[in-house]
Each structure stands twice: as C-alpha cells, then as structure tokens.
C-alpha cells in the first residue's frame, strides 16, 4: 500500500471513490493531514492549478494601484481587518497559505506532519527563505512568533484559536468589576511550542486539533522579525516580496519590489494602495477615471455601475463572508435570551438580500455556520414570525418593545443598507433602532465595545475556526461578549474530530445553542465581488478579500 503522511487518508480516498465526499472535500481534508497539494490533485486525477503558472509569461515592470482603506496598524499580530492584513502581507508572510478553493498549502513551511491522534504537529521550515535584510529564516523566528501570539498581554486573536489545544485558561486570582473571577491564559506546557532543530518546530498539543494549518494562515499570524518586536512601518523587515516605503493612514501605502525574493514574482516594480474614503461613489469614480487599477472590494451596487466600463473586468466568488447584528448579553435589554430570539424572528432574510445585496447572497441561520462548511448540520428553518417575536418580548418584560442604538459604518454601502432594512424590520415588533453610522476610523475603535453593532465577518473555510474566533469565551474577537460553557466545551470537542460527518453531529448541538441562546442576528451569506482593469494580469479573487501583489502584473 502506498505510504501516506496520515493513516486517515486511505479512508478519505475510499469515501471519495464511494461518492460519500466530493473531490474538493478530499483535497481540503487530505492536505490538512499533510498530503502535498500535487499528490492530492494526482489522487483525484487533476492537475494542481498552481503548477500551471508560468512566470515567463508574465509581463515585468510597472506600478499597480488598488483602492483600499489604509487603517492604523499598531501591531501586525493585532490585525483585526482584512485591509490591515493586506497592507502587511506584502512585506511579512505566513507559514501556510489557504487558496481560493479552501485548500491549505505549506508556504514558509516546506511541509507539516501530524500524529495519528492530531495532537502533535511537526512544522518543517523552508531552508531557502531569507529576510529582506539578509539573515535566513529559522526555527527561532517561528517559535518567537508563535509564543508571542500566545501571550495574553499581546492581545492577539490567534490566542482564541490556540485556546483549547495549545493554550489553557486559569483563574488569575482577581475579581472583575462585577465580582466574577478574572481569567487569564498561558501555554499549557513548557514544551507546547518546541524547537526541534534550526528548521523544525513541533507543536505538542493537549487536545486534538484538525485546523492547525488554517490557524497558521489566520491574518494576524504573520511571521515577524523578532528584532522589530511587533513594530510595523516603512522599512519593516520581512520575508515577503515587497518593501514598504511609505504609509500614511487614510491616504496610501507604497511599496517597491524586492529583487531577491525567495518565491514567485514579484513582476511589478512598485505597488500602491490608495485610500478612497468612506463614500462608495469614490470607488466608481476612481475606476472610471483610471485613478486606480482595481478595488479590493466592490459591492453589488458598485458592480452594477461599473460592469459596462469597457476597460473593467468583474470578479465574483461565493464565500462564507457575512454580517451579524450582535448584541451584548450583559446589557439589560439583551440579557433575557427571549429578547435575542425575538430579534431573530423579526427579520425577513430574502427581503434583506434583495434590498441590501441586490440578490447577491443566500439566507443564513443565525449560527454562523454556512452550508459550504464541511461540518455544517442542517437544522429546521424558521420563517419570520412577528406575533411570536412580540410574545417573546412581552414575556421578557418588554410588552411595548424598547429603543436602542445600533452602531455601523457607511462603507461598504451594503453594510449601511443592511442596517437600515434590519431597523425597519425590528420596528415591526416594537423595537426602535437608532442607526449610528460612524466614520470608519471611529467605528474601528468601538467595534468590540458597542452594546449593539453591525459587524462584517470574513470568509473562513472551517466553521470551527470562525466560532472559535468570534464566540469562545474571552476570545479577543468575541465582540458580542458571549460566554457559554456548554458552547465552549462542544467547540473544543468539535475541533478534535477528524471526520466531518461526526463533527457535524457536535456542530448540530452548537448551532442549536446559537439559535436558542446566541448573541447574533445573521441575515445572509454574501457573494464577494470586485473589479480590476483588464490590463491587470494574474489576479484571482480570494474569498477572504486578500491581495497578493507578487502574483499580479501589468500588461503594457
């Protein structure tokens, strides 16, 4: 029998042969278990698309300009928006890479190996990678980064992903303002993150975890030069294809290409992000006038305005990108779960999709698990029910409803449109919502602290990753302040189950908790789209809104 890196891979082959899983599911699962993409594609009788790219065919030189917000970046390990990561990722890189088909590959890693029980992950670092300033990338660099994001004093959202298999919570011996015990966290053992040799790192986990390679591509999980100690700006050292030469918050980011980059490309001489502000019309005008060559994102309204421009190509991809109207359960109006249930019953999802997205989406189910996620469990759908929602409010002590502020931002316009339709529908059950549309810079400061807020969440290939980031107790990105011990326990259990069918049985319980007790109203899953000038070559829209400028070129 052919030797595979994990004993479960032959089972996956049998399941694919029997039609129990699709070829794409096989590719996703087998590569997580350490099978190379080339080998996985060979098993399914396909050619790895990345092997077809020919650098010789790409035009060389020129400057590419993409319209995107340029936010303040305090520390790459704290990056909390895709736009911030796009600024950083041209300079600093990741150990892994999840492509637009949700297949995860080694990147700064040569390969990884995982034990049969999913508790030991051995990471083999490429030996040909050098930092821009000349030194080689080593295991010491990787260990420093992994330990840094595991430190609660840093505040990285990666900590929420590592909690449950590398990091454990403990009682800090103090009380918060409400008299509850304060929790902190730490690596579960001294050798949890272990240097094996100069190019090998081992993760010794206390619990099984299937999604480690995808966690290593979570957008704050950059590999930074320890000498920079988390600082980022012009001249920051990185292993990536570009050097940042200028960065002005709210205006632009400018780069020049490295000539000694270890990987593919870059083909451009220079690259630039142009901040076009909060007005969505500015993006349309910038494309029309050729002020920029493309946008990082364009919603359905913008696409409708630009699709007939003769120099423009439109790109679309189905995603697990969404938006949630999330409530703080520790606020008086939202403490009773019946209020949160009523808010969910108040909405007409199809109407929101047609009005806010011009139809470019599919209904969601208030649990942040998409049908495209391999562990999704189908639960009974529930329609809009105004009378039931009103009764729930009355039973919770609000027979006449209540009034509350909802924070959102004006750009992208689909978010504000969604807020307006939600407010109209909440009003039908007696809940008057005052929309507070803040300038983006102000919104970014309060997105986790506002008691009721509309927040967009990006695409992730596994639901367990999103749930860990967004709803695990005390996670840095737990903007809803949700805390449910049963939810946390089930999530940790799901993260260690290899077979997605078995995982979906646990996921059904998690989804039911979210629909019954959870903190969100989730109307839809969104089709992601953008535009590029037809002279831009090599662009392929990533479902996570990521920009990889070293892959792009400008046709002369």
Each PLM stretch: what is its role?
Residues 530-556:
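Long beta-strand-rich cores associated with HINT superfamily self-processing modules
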Residues 99-103, 173-194, 198-200, 204-272, ...:
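Gly/Pro-rich hinge or "lid" segments in bacterial periplasmic/extracellular proteins
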Residues 191-194, 428-443, 466-534, 556:
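Extracytoplasmic/peripheral linker and loop segments enriched in polar/acidic and small residues
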Residues 362-395, 410-415:
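Structural transition elements
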Residues 1-25, 48-50:
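N-terminal secretory signal peptides
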Residues 66, 134, 287, 297, ...:
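Periplasmic binding protein-like
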Residues 67-116, 147, 235-238:
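N-terminal lobe/hinge region of extracytoplasmic solute-binding protein
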Residues 245-256, 272-331, 441, 451:
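Extracellular/periplasmic solute-recognition and catalytic clefts
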């Amino acid at each position: 029998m052919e030797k595979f890196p994990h004993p479960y891979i032959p089972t996956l082959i049998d399941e694919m042969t029997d039609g129990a899983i699709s070829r794409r599911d096989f590719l996703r699962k087998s590569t997580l278990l350490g099978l190379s993409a080339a080998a996985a594609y060979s098993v399914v009788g396909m050619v790895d698309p990345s092997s077809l790219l020919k650098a010789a065919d790409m035009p060389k030189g020129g400057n590419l300009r993409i319209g995107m917000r340029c936010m303040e970046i305090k520390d790459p390990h704290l990056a909390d928006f895709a736009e911030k990561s796009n600024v950083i990722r041209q300079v600093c890189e990741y150990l892994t890479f999840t492509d637009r088909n949700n297949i995860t590959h080694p990147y700064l890693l040569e390969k990884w190996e995982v034990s049969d029980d999913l508790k030991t992950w051995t990471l083999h670092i490429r030996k040909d990678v050098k930092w821009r300033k000349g030194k080689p990338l080593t295991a010491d660099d990787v260990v420093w980064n992994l330990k840094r994001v595991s430190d609660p004093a840093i505040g990285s959202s990666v900590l929420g992903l590592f909690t449950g298999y590398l990091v454990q919570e403990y009682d800090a011996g103090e009380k918060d303002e409400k008299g509850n015990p304060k929790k902190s966290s730490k690596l579960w053992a001294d050798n949890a993150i272990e240097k094996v040799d100069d190019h090998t790192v081992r993760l010794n986990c206390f619990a099984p975890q299937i999604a480690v390679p995808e966690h290593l591509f979570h957008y704050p999980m950059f590999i930074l030069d320890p000498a920079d100690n988390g600082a980022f700006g012009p001249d920051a050292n990185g292993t990536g294809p570009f050097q940042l030469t200028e960065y002005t918050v709210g205006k632009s980011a400018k780069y020049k290409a490295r000539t000694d980059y270890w990987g593919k490309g870059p083909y451009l001489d220079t690259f630039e992000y142009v901040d076009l502000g909060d007005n969505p019309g500015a993006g349309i005008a910038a494309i029309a006038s050729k002020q920029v060559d493309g946008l990082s994102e364009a919603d359905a309204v913008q696409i409708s305005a630009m699709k007939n421009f003769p120099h423009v190509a439109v790109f679309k991809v189905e995603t697990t990108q969404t938006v949630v109207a999330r409530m703080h359960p520790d606020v008086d109006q939202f403490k009773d779960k019946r209020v949160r249930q009523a808010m969910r019953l108040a909405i007409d999802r199809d109407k929101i999709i047609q009005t806010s997205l011009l139809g470019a989406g599919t209904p969601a189910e208030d649990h942040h698990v998409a049908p495209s996620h391999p562990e999704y469990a189908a639960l009974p759908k529930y329609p809009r029910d105004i009378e039931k929602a009103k009764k729930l409010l009355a039973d919770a002590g609000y027979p006449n409803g209540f009034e509350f502020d909802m924070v959102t931002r004006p750009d992208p316009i689909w978010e504000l449109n969604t807020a307006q339709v939600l407010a109209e529908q909440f009003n039908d059950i007696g809940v008057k919502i005052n929309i507070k549309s803040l300038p983006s810079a102000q919104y970014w400061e309060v997105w986790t602290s506002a008691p009721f807020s509309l927040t967009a969440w990006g695409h992730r290939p596994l639901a367990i990753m999103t749930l860990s980031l967004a709803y695990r107790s005390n996670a840095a990105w737990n903007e809803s302040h949700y805390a449910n011990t049963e939810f946390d326990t089930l999530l940790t259990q799901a993260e260690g189950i290899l077979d997605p069918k078995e995982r979906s049985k646990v996921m059904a319980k998690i989804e039911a908790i979210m629909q019954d007790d959870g903190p969100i109203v989730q109307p839809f899953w969104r089709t992601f789209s953008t535009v590029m000038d037809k002279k831009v070559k090599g662009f392929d829209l990533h479902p996570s809104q990521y920009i990889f400028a070293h892959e792009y070129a400008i046709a002369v």
